[in-house]
């Protein structure tokens, strides 16, 4: 058997001193050697170390990942905090904005509330004022409807129903009898005689606007005016006379004295003894005057004085520009009395107005509703007139549709005739030529005035014709309405009021106020008050004081009433 103990050296020697590669041991050999254990152990240790290193690296990576996660969490947390802080700041800003907005809204709300309160206060004030105005208007209506409710006893209880309470002072104020009648500046030494129906206050001396304006509705039909307005205008204007061409040194007194003397000299004083002139108003700048006569008839008689010489100056005597012939015709004559003694003052019917001679112009085809002022304005477009005469019906005072005129400059006569002849005026065609041309006189227009004008004149004739003879009985109109006479107590109060107020002018014998019939039948004289005095002097004083006064907002018309009708119970006059 070989000696294995020396194999090692032999082998080393065999290989030439080089160590042979280790031979693997068979498992069914002698078993592992210590070196094998050492190697195995070393390998195992290496593997363990490698594993440890891997574990360390893995743990390091895990820790790094953890740190990264922590950093990410920190960053996320920081970002979240920043976002939260940003959101908080945004919220704070929003809250600030909301607070500012809310403050502004509150301020606006307060302002709106204050404005609403002010508006509400203004509305309340307006409502109060409106209510007060409505109440005042209702009170005024009540006063006008009741007129003169006054207490019959000064000791009557003040808490009585308002509709029945009538204090003495309120009654005086409501009734209007505490107001003086319209007065004018009466000339010294001239007796003021009242006209037939009260007129309006005269203008201030020296102030005369609208001297010759065209009347409203100048090319239309006759205007319709309320009865009271027509009465005032017609009465005053029918009693006034325009006097032009006055000398520079003329004054109211000298004009009044002159025309009163002239009217007396020609027999023109038809209203009785005394001065015919009531008032004179002079425009010194333009040297003309308005002379107011006592009556319509005396004013018409004064028309014959056109061309009269006053203190060396020839004067023009005309109707005022607002003279209404239709209304004036219901109050008295509109033409001068043909029996006037004009020769007493150096005048003659042919010379008055200078409307005689070869240069006199005939103007025909005039519309009936044209006024004197309108026709004069048309003719004076060719030059000033020396004379003008619109021919009128003596009964009605309405225009007959033709006129005569003479120009101051006679050289324009033919020019005016040629220019005006054939012109259309409304539904008429003018015929203008020299009056002495041809052998026949122009045929007057036969057409009547418009039917409406006739009806208006008839109504005026019935309602406004005054009594010319002074009597002991006065008739007052425009004082009360029929509605005020239904209540017995109101009726008694009105009676007492009339006795108290109207008894101040003399011995008042009786007061009669016709009442409406209970069955609704018409009763004559309803709305009038009849006053019977003991003498004419007392009734004249009452008429002078009451005529034209305001009573319950209306202007009272006081006229003399026939005594025989009054005693017979005829109150429909």
Swiss-Prot record:
Coiled-coil stretches: none
Lineage: Eukaryota, Viridiplantae, Streptophyta, Embryophyta, Tracheophyta
Record gene name: U2AF65B
UniProt entry keywords in alphabetical sequence: mRNA processing, mRNA splicing, Nucleus, Repeat, RNA-binding
Pfam family, one: RRM_1
Task performed by this protein: Necessary for the splicing of pre-mRNA. Binds to the U -enriched regions of plant introns.
Keyword RNA-binding part of the UniProt annotation: yes
Family: Belongs to the splicing factor SR family.
RRM domain segment(s): 239-322, 359-437, 478-564
SMART domains reported for this sequence: RRM
Biased composition (Acidic residues): 1-12
Protein name: Splicing factor U2af large subunit B
GO cellular component terms attached to this protein's record: nucleus
Domain of life (superkingdom): Eukaryota
TM segment ranges: none
GO molecular function: RNA binding
Bias kind Basic and acidic residues: ranges: 38-145
Location(s), subcellular: Nucleus
Tissue/organ expression: Expressed in stems, leaves and apical buds.
Keyword hit for Nucleus: yes
Residue ranges, compositional bias (Basic residues): 161-173
Segments of this protein annotated with the region Disordered: 1-187
Domain notes: N-terminal RS domain has a very strong bias in favor of D over S.
GO biological process assignments: mRNA processing; RNA splicing
SUPFAM superfamilies tied to this protein: RNA-binding domain, RBD (SSF54928)
């Amino acid at each position: 058997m070989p000696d294995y103990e020396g194999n090692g050296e032999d082998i080393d020697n065999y290989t030439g001193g080089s160590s042979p590669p280790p031979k693997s041991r068979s498992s069914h050999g002698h078993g592992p050697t210590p070196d094998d254990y050492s190697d195995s152990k070393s390998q195992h240790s290496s593997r363990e170390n490698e594993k440890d290193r891997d574990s360390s690296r893995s743990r390091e990576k895990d820790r790094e990942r953890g740190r990264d996660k922590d950093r990410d969490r920190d960053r996320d947390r920081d970002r979240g905090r920043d976002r939260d802080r940003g959101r908080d700041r945004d919220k704070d800003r929003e809250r600030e904005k909301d607070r500012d907005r809310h403050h502004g809204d509150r301020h606006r709300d307060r302002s709106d509330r204050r404005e609403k309160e002010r508006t509400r206060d203004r509305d309340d004030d307006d409502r109060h004022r409106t209510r007060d105005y409505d109440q005042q208007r209702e009170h005024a209506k009540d006063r006008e409807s009741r007129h003169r409710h006054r207490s019959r006893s000064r000791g009557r209880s003040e808490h009585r129903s308002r509709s029945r309470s009538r204090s003495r002072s309120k009654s005086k104020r409501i009734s209007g009898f505490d107001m003086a009648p319209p007065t004018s500046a009466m000339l010294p030494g001239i007796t003021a005689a009242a006209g037939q129906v009260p007129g309006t206050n005269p203008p201030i001396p020296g102030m005369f606007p609208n001297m010759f304006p065209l009347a409203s509705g100048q090319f239309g039909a006759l205007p319709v005016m309320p009865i009271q307005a027509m009465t005032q205008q017609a009465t005053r204007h029918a009693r006034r006379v325009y006097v032009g061409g006055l000398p520079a040194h003329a004054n109211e007194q000298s004009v009044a004295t002159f025309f009163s003397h002239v009217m007396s000299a020609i027999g023109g004083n038809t209203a009785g003894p005394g001065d015919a002139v009531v008032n004179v108003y002079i425009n010194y700048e333009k040297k003309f005057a308005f002379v107011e006569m006592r009556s319509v008839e005396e004013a018409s008689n004064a028309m014959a004085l056109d061309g009269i010489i006053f203190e060396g100056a020839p004067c023009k005597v005309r109707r005022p520009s607002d003279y209404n012939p239709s209304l004036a015709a219901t109050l008295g004559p509109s033409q001068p009395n043909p029996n006037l003694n004009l020769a007493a003052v150096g005048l003659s019917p042919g010379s008055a107005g200078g409307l005689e001679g070869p240069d006199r112009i005939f103007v025909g085809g005039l519309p009936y509703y044209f006024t004197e002022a309108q026709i004069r304005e048309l003719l004076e477009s060719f030059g000033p007139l020396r004379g003008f005469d619109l021919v009128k019906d003596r009964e009605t005072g309405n225009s007959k549709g033709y006129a005569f005129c003479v120009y101051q400059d006679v050289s324009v006569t033919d020019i005016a005739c040629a220019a005006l002849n054939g012109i259309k005026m409304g539904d008429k065609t003018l015929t203008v030529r020299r009056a002495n041309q041809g052998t026949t006189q122009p045929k007057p227009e036969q057409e009547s005035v418009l039917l409406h004008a006739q009806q208006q004149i008839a109504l005026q004739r019935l309602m406004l014709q005054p009594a010319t003879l002074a009597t002991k009985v006065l008739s007052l109109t425009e004082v009360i309405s029929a509605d005020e006479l239904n209540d017995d107590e109101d009726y008694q109060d009105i009676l007492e009021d009339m006795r108290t107020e109207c008894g101040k002018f003399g011995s008042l014998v009786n007061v009669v106020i016709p009442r409406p019939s209970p069955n609704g039948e018409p009763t004559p004289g309803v709305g009038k008050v009849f006053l019977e005095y003991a003498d004419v002097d007392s009734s004249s004083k009452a008429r002078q004081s009451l005529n034209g006064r305001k009573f319950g907002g209306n202007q009272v018309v006081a006229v003399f009433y026939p005594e025989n009708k009054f005693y017979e119970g005829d109150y429909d006059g």
